[in-house]
């Protein structure tokens, strides 16, 4: 998310310092998976220069009680978003609706109504079909994910040239499916990318009552099984990454597919097994094994791990936690 780095750091400092959330990575759990989530949250607060925005932190903390009491971060986060909304008139990305979508997700996770937040309907820009498609499949997918995250209906925006509907976004996404069943950001790609395929599956998961969506989802799952590496991980643009593992984990759990499903276990290795290999001693996650800790990788790993914890506890997966 290309928000001002200064604003991001300031917002996270408000959350971390004023409300006393940082524990410098010292919190521990008897559950190694929960311990990984605790470490990721602590790292993101402690190393604010690497944070790319607080939205996913709110999603994780709101979805798993053991990470942080809501009264320690909710008000500070809402205040920082409200100030930013006043500066931009409630439109966080005039040509990048993915930015708008992620703010909607963060505000919703913090317990607020994104369709009426400080006098702004943050969902309104997602009704602009043409602007959403400036980002292609990314814009269409995130528009659906954000609206469904809080159970929001598609708003009506009289100021746009083409009023979007959820079905329009779904139809566009389906038109981008590749012969191998996967999806990719590039319109010239020949093969599916695990990150984009995982994201698309999250967007489509609520619409499998449509036969064409159900068929597309099954084809995409076949693709993800076929391109999984022997160590349980995934390669994107030539590199095995933590983010690829995280996106596929989120997609499978959203669809109700357990991580030990035989289609997604290679040589005894699950995707979660591989994801945890990216974890560093300080609690953060690397983008590529051998690299330094990366903020985006840590955010995405954190969300995937919290989602896994919720499902294992018999709770709805993380994208259904706030509906």
For each predicted feature, which ranges?
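Internal amphipathic alpha-helical repeat/solenoid segments
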Residues: 43-50, 76-95, 126-131
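Terminal, non-catalytic domain-edge segments
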Residues: 27-39, 274, 289-323
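Core helices of alpha-solenoid repeat scaffolds
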Residues: 37, 74, 119-123, 166, ...
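An alpha-helical repeat/solenoid feature that recognizes helix-turn-helix modules
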Residues: 46-69, 91-115, 132-166, 178-218, ...
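Helix-boundary/low-complexity linker signature
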Residues: 26-28, 38-43, 150-157, 171-175, ...
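C-terminal motif of bacterial Sec signal peptides marking the signal peptidase cleavage site
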Residues: 20-23
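Bacterial N-terminal signal peptides that target proteins for export
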Residues: 2-9
């Amino acid at each position: 998310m290309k928000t001002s780095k200064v604003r991001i750091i300031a917002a996270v400092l408000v959350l971390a310092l004023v409300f006393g959330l940082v524990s410098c990575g010292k919190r521990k759990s008897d559950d190694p998976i929960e311990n990984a989530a605790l470490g990721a949250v602590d790292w993101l607060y402690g190393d604010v220069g690497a944070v790319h925005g607080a939205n996913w932190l709110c999603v994780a903390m709101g979805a798993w009680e053991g990470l942080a009491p809501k009264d320690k971060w909710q008000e500070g986060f809402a205040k920082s978003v409200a100030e930013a909304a006043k500066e931009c008139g409630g439109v966080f990305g005039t040509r990048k609706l993915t930015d708008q979508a992620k703010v909607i997700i963060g505000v919703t996770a913090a317990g607020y109504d994104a369709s009426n937040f400080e006098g702004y309907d943050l969902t309104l820009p997602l009704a602009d079909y043409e602007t959403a498609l400036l980002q292609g499949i990314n814009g269409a997918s995130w528009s659906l994910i954000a609206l469904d995250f809080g159970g929001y209906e598609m708003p009506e925006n009289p100021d746009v040239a083409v009023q979007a509907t959820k079905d329009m976004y779904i139809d566009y996404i389906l038109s981008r499916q590749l012969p191998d069943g996967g999806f990719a950001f590039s319109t010239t790609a020949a093969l599916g990318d695990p990150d984009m395929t995982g994201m698309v599956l999250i967007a489509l998961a609520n619409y499998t009552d449509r036969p064409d969506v159900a068929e597309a989802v099954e084809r995409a799952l076949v693709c993800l099984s076929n391109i999984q590496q022997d160590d349980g991980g995934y390669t994107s643009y030539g590199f095995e990454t933590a983010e690829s593992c995280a996106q596929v984990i989120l997609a499978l759990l959203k669809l109700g597919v357990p991580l030990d499903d035989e289609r997604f276990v290679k040589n005894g290795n699950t995707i979660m097994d591989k994801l945890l290999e990216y974890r560093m001693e300080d609690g953060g996650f690397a983008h590529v094994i051998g690299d330094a800790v990366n903020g985006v990788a840590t955010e995405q790993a954190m969300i995937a791990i919290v989602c896994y914890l919720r499902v294992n506890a018999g709770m709805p997966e993380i994208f259904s936690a706030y509906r």
